[in-house]
Regions:
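Conserved structural motif at the start of ABC-family nucleotide-binding domains
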Residues: 5-7, 20
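Short coil-to-beta microelement around the adenine-binding A-loop and adjacent beta1/P-loop entry
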Residues: 17-18, 71
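ABC nucleotide-binding domain signature
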Residues: 33, 75-82, 97
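The feature captures the beta-strand-to-loop junction immediately N-terminal to the Walker
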Residues: 35-37
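Conserved ABC transporter NBD signature motif
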Residues: 58-73
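Conserved ABC ATPase "signature" region
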Residues: 97, 101, 108-121
């Protein structure tokens, strides 16, 4: 089974502040938990993995794609941040439907997928 997430000698600096230093790790498919004390780099690793921030050094691969600039990756990757970011005043239905429309689906496709998605929860 191939590893789905690969960090190769990755470092991230925020100006003079070190976020993570020379991290190399491979994560196989499945459920993985990052555990550590405050300031240990858990959020930085997640932000690097999703492309929200770019590494200062090293290489990252998620499902064979670089998170640096990969629209393909964002079609298959979901990420829930540690803070609420759901827009106020919008329903779950509208949020899913509008997101699908923004990703180029037709109205009929977006409607069908929204219904299917909400039936799962």
């Amino acid at each position: 089974m191939n590893d789905q997430i690969i960090f190769e000698d990755v470092s991230k600096f925020y100006g003079e502040v070190l976020g993570v230093n020379r991290i190399s790790l491979s994560i196989p498919p499945g459920i993985t938990t990052l555990v550590g004390p405050n300031g240990s780099g858990k959020t930085t690793l997640m932000n690097l993995m999703t492309g929200l921030v770019q590494p200062s050094n090293g290489r990252i691969s998620v499902m064979g794609l670089s998170p640096a600039n990969s629209p393909e990756l964002f079609r298959i990757l979901g990420y829930c941040a540690q803070f609420d970011s759901f827009p106020r005043g919008i329903t779950g239905w509208d949020f899913i439907f509008d997101s699908l429309m923004l990703h180029g689906m037709s109205e009929a496709e977006a409607f069908e997928l929204t219904v299917e998605s909400l039936e799962r929860v």
